[in-house]
Amino acid sequence: MGNITAKLVKDLRDKTGAGMMDCKKALNETEGNLDKALEWLRKKGIASAEKKSGRVAAEGSIGSYIHTGSRVGVLLELNCETDFVARGDIFQSLLKDVSMQVAACPNVEYVSIDEIPEEVVEKEKQIEMGRDDLSGKPEQIKEKIVEGRIAKRLNELVLLSQPYIKDSSLTVEDLVKQAAAKIGENIKVRRFTRYTLGEGIEKNQIDFAEEVASMQTN
């Protein structure tokens, strides 16, 4: 792996408008080769998508997905910049794919890491700090282990961090950025709601043997 310097990361950011972490990843994947890293970002749809990410996305569409058997349903709001793009095939296909992703991810609660409340982060930290396998470890080492575990746990709660169900080499965030690059507009997943049939309803549990016995006495 090549020497990934801060200057190299800055140069790639200046050329592409991509985020720092995306640039670092691209350079690591291409052993520090700037031209190859630029191409890597373009293939991922990140290079041009990042430049659009600051623009207002107030149009869009609300999509729905009902899973086979009608036991899971999803409503999802996907935003873009113009109504024309919202009606297009690329946008509508993305809306369907992301809605399907939510249906397949019952543990996902938030769109992005930024949406996770501080109290949730703190609760996860307390849980991890109290685990038996950390007892006796120096505080500094314990903090690093907990930090890694929390990051992993929080990503499990976030839609954009999920591996895309149709291509696990991509995340949902990658998928959105690729669509934004193709369309030439900013695209944002605004919010979603996932419904599961019977969720929250307390069901009566009947013992099968008791049920048969009661039928025989009638």
UniProtKB/Swiss-Prot annotation:
GO molecular function, one term: translation elongation factor activity
Chief location category: cytoplasm
Location of this chain's protein in the cell: Cytoplasm
Residue pairs linked by disulfide bridges in the UniProt entry: none
A GO cellular component annotation in the UniProt record: cytoplasm
Region (Involved in Mg(2+) ion dislocation from EF-Tu): 82-85
Keywords: Cytoplasm, Elongation factor, Protein biosynthesis
SUPFAM superfamilies with a match to the protein in the record: Elongation factor Ts (EF-Ts), dimerisation domain, UBA-like
Role of this protein: Associates with the EF-Tu.GDP complex and induces the exchange of GDP to GTP. It remains bound to the aminoacyl-tRNA.EF-Tu.GTP complex up to the GTP hydrolysis stage on the ribosome.
UniProt record similarity statement: Belongs to the EF-Ts family.
Listed name of the protein: Elongation factor Ts
Native organism taxonomy: Bacteria, Bacillati, Cyanobacteriota, Cyanophyceae, Synechococcales
UniProt gene name: tsf
